[in-house]
Amino acid sequence: MTSFREFAETCQAIEKISSTIDTTSRVADLLKKVDVEELPIATHFIMSEVFPAWSGEQLGIGTSLLYVSLSKASGMPVKSIESLIRTTGDIGDTALLILKEKRKNQVTFSSFFEEQPELSITEVYNRFKIASEASGKGSQDIKIKNLQFLFTSSTPREAKYISRLALEELRIGVGEGVVRDAIAKAFSVPVDVVEHAFMVTNDLGIVAATAKDGGVEALESLGIEINRPIKMMLSQISPDIVADIKEMKEAAIEWKFDGARVQVHKAGDSVMLFSRKLENVTNSLPDLVEIIRKHVKAESAILDGEAVAVDENGRPRAFQEILKRFRRKYDVEEKALGIPIQLNLFDIMYLNGKTLIDLPLIERRKALESCVESSVEDSKSISVDKQVITGDLDLIEKIYKEALDAGHEGVMVKNPNSFYSPGKRGKNWLKKKPLMETLDLVVVGAEWGFGRRANLLGSYTVACYDPKTLRFLQVGKVGTGLTDDQLKELTEILSGLMEGGEAGGIFAIRPKIVLEIAFEEIQKSPNYDSGFALRFPRFIRIRDDKDPEEADTIQRIGKVYSQQLKRL
């Protein structure tokens, strides 16, 4: 078994490295040392994950529970731990200091001759697993007991990274790109083979173990599996849709719906539904399960679509209405009657045992239409999104206006010859919407309001994402556009994500919540670490369907800024 000490030493070394190439080499060195059985664990750990995202497993450990566990392991009162965190700003550094002090005070003559058994990577994983599965009465005690065991069994350096892992934030800047390249380097396989294996498995842990065990041939044999969701292909806003269509010569035009992405997995009568964030939402949408059983005529299939909440006339309801269905855990049938859903399917990635992502869109479209049956009446609940392949700009404008008149967001403009690229955003899928510019940004700070908002978090520091450094870079503060109910909801959510101390009245917030923000323009600014600031930002909605890493990037901020200059 691989010791957790080895993992912690790698993390510590990476923290001191600024070069991506050197970081990749250190990760590759670690992967080479780890036993093949433990590689999935180590691979996810180094990316600040305990479980693969597709699994739906949640660790369920918050800062309060972590403080109690650390208190029990060290003897330091929780309030003292909270005070120390306000100084260090980091749970990992706090755990390191506390356990260093404890070890110093525990040194005795006999302790010099006692050898503490080493924690293994597997032992750490197993303790996290037990904690994650605890539920009901006594579950908090079980979580605390297992965390306490890890802290008392670890060295101070190991405790630093155990505590960060418990919050799934190692803060060492290692993401999927680095690990992909590290797997290629460690096991001497081409990067493009690793990339494709990741696309079809959505699990770099599986990819790493397969690469070590069987090399290129084994990696090339990996494929999509039912009930293991893959990342969804993404679209980007086109700055010049006319030029993009002319470049394609002909484009596949589809309506763009203001709903929630759904990935459908069907095997016989078994149906599972996954959200954009790859959460299993099957139990929340029983009506959709029955619709799919009835109308998808395939023994096995994985489909991509958009679920839209509709009114009695079949027109789309507000985006937040569909999210109410996705979140629902109780009174599901009652909510289904109150908020009916229409499923609009537009792609297929797998059909009857065959992976289709490497086929062009026009071929995938034929496969999709062949396995979905719905009459005009049925189309109120399920349909294949209408598609027109054309280069006629007047016709495209007509379809665009029809989509808006029907209450939808606009149109998708797709390259008919493009493959399905899981998790990728690029020029093969473009969206055209009305001109009001919005950005999806992550909350990284919040401050208490005044007057009527005195007991509410009323202003939020928002940030874009830098995929190169894996950091969130601030672009401004937003406090307008929110209703009282939205303020209460965000206060409840963000209060549980506060970390570190208060600086200038602003509390640091763990980057978990994505907001859609409208703005008048982007300006250059030295006040934020992104180098940019939003002018007149305004809250539009919470994007529960997006992970923080799906927020708009610093590169997109720069591109929007450059486009503004061209319009002057």
UniProtKB/Swiss-Prot annotation:
GO MF: ATP binding; DNA binding; DNA ligase (ATP) activity; metal ion binding
Keywords, sorted A to Z: ATP-binding, Cell cycle, Cell division, DNA damage, DNA recombination, DNA repair, DNA replication, Ligase, Magnesium, Metal-binding, Nucleotide-binding
GO BP term, pick one: DNA recombination
Catalytic residues, chain numbering: 256 (n6-amp-lysine intermediate)
Keyword Cell division attributed: yes
Cofactor: Mg(2+)
Entry's EC annotation: 6.5.1.1
Reactions accelerated catalytically: ATP + (deoxyribonucleotide)n-3'-hydroxyl + 5'-phospho-(deoxyribonucleotide)m = (deoxyribonucleotide)n+m + AMP + diphosphate
InterPro entries per record: ATP-dep_DNA_ligase, DNA_ligae_ATP-dep_bac/arc, DNA_ligase_ATP-dep, DNA_ligase_ATP-dep_C, DNA_ligase_ATP-dep_cent, DNA_ligase_ATP-dep_CS, DNA_ligase_ATP-dep_N, DNA_ligase_N_sf
Binding of ATP, residues: 254, 261, 276, 306, 346, 425, 431
Family: Belongs to the ATP-dependent DNA ligase family.
Role summary: DNA ligase that seals nicks in double-stranded DNA during DNA replication, DNA recombination and DNA repair.
Name recorded for this polypeptide: DNA ligase 2
Naturally occurring in which organism (per UniProt): Methanosarcina barkeri (strain Fusaro / DSM 804)
Originating gene: lig2
